[in-house]
Amino acid sequence: MTLHPPLEVSSREANGIHYVDIHGRLTIGDPSEHLSHFMQDLVSKGARKVIVNLNEIPQIDSSGISALVKLSISLARQGGGLHLVCGEGRVRDALTVTRLVEAIPTYDSETAALAGF
């Protein structure tokens, strides 16, 4: 069995926008649950506009995608929104195949994601 480093999630806020950086595999089990709890806490503390940077995750599965969809729905219900940052590669391919890029605005950079708000 291959052990993978734990998912690391951090956030920073500037001008009402919350930037979330994720490092590690966003897959079923602890990683997806960790992200979900982190995001629920962020929303409960008032975050409404969130940019999630996925550039440092090498892999995402359906559980990770589900966590992002739930966050998007939660923010929309609060009058906010979710934007994703994801460059080319396996994760962007997964987001495209699942059509998540059509449901959640996805950009190549944080600057572009910010301009999308």
What are these regions (language model features)?
Residues 105-109:
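Short acidic-hydrophobic, aromatic-tinged amphipathic segments that line or gate anion-handling sites
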Residues 25-104:
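Amphipathic alpha-helical interaction surfaces in cytosolic regulatory modules
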Residues 89, 111-112:
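Acidic phosphotransfer microenvironment of two-component signaling modules
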Residues 3-37:
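STAS-typified acidic loop motif
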Residues 116-117:
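A short, charged, amphipathic alpha-helix used as a generic interaction element across diverse proteins
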